[in-house]
């Protein structure tokens, strides 16, 4: 079910050809020039923690603009690409790749690339910007702290000092495998959804039970269908929305600028129930009190086809126990909470797949003052900058739920905002104003069914960026660079003039961020 990594001829498909042409034009217009071989970037020097998509993308932007980056990765080089280096061979993008353009130089060969092509693009980006010599593999970051001069130290002084830090550890760490009663009695394999390919699990002609109802369950279902399982039963505890695998629909749903349920939210919910779920699957949709703009949806159309033709079943309930060849489930009706009343049902299974997700990587390596209530993550400035440290940004590892994409061009915008703060002291926000922005966002989203930063949409994120640049006149000169990654020389020339005008010492004193 996952798309093949062997792309079809672009010339035989006009839309694909136009898409690839657009990608090439964006690459030529917006990709920073790779640094010269064996060249040393100028200050600022930035530490990047994590070598997944976010870490490699951020480091490539930093080096492409002539600055220095060092990547710290806890795993070996085989884990370059983060979670994509560890998932199944059948895994692929659920959203269209137009929403997964994590760098301007990425050139997708098709709309829904598979794992192999995604990892290939990450490695190509890593090599293009000369990050091989700047990556420290097998180096787990235990502590990030500042010296007396305010520069950052990672683990210890042996790695040198850094002007800024980007934390890019993501949200998917070690596989989560909760114990189930009777697991030792089950005669077949019990395996995590991310290890199906690695462990060569044979599901051909077998009954497969998938424990879990999120993105991992979709991945496991794709693997089972691709390998011709006889029957697949998804056992989901949660009530999650499923949306079509359609670029236009997905983009429209991310355009709710308020980032919360509104009086018009019933419209997309009604449309999904009546035209995507349909009358035969409407019971699988979340109850009316579970709004769409409260949780991350699953993006898949094939699953609905499998449910309609009987190859798969979707049961809502709680796992009671495993027996020798079955899973006992407390099956609940729609709207009944987890562990609520239901009735027992026996699901026969030859293979049990634990689609239970991943442990979230810890941010405990950061200074304690990053986690002071009520401004703990995700309640940070622009959701990534802790109020005490505008020289530190945790990109793609603080969000809870969203409608949009974690692998899109916001990675570059966040990185360039950090560079702006590092280069130009007059643009740096003070801790007071960073906290006031958090308070303002909470006020604007008061009354929402979720906490202010527990859910957002992509258009809301863009609005945050626009507000960040517009609210401070000294940031206006950086707007083109921040949003498009071009024209760095113009704001840098302004910075030099401002420094001479204000006197360098007075210029430095205008930095109110405690991390400088």
Annotated model-derived regions:
Residues 49, 160-173, 208-211, 346-359:
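Short hydrophobic core segments
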Residues 20, 33-41, 53, 58, ...:
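Rossmann-like dinucleotide-binding core of oxidoreductases
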Residues 2-32, 382-383, 390-516:
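C-terminal, flexible cofactor-proximal segment of oxidoreductases
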Residues 284-370, 449-516:
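C-terminal catalytic lobe of FAD-dependent flavoproteins
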Residues 3-16, 48-133, 230-231, 236-247, ...:
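Beta1-alpha1 glycine-rich phosphate/pyrophosphate-binding loop at the start
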Residues 133-135, 188-189, 311-313, 392:
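Short, conserved active-site loop motifs that form the nucleotide-linked donor/cofactor pocket
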Residues 111-173, 307, 321-326:
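Feature captures the FAD/FMN-dependent oxidoreductase FAD-binding
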Residues 189, 193-199, 325-328, 344-345, ...:
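FAD-site-proximal beta/loop scaffold in flavoenzymes
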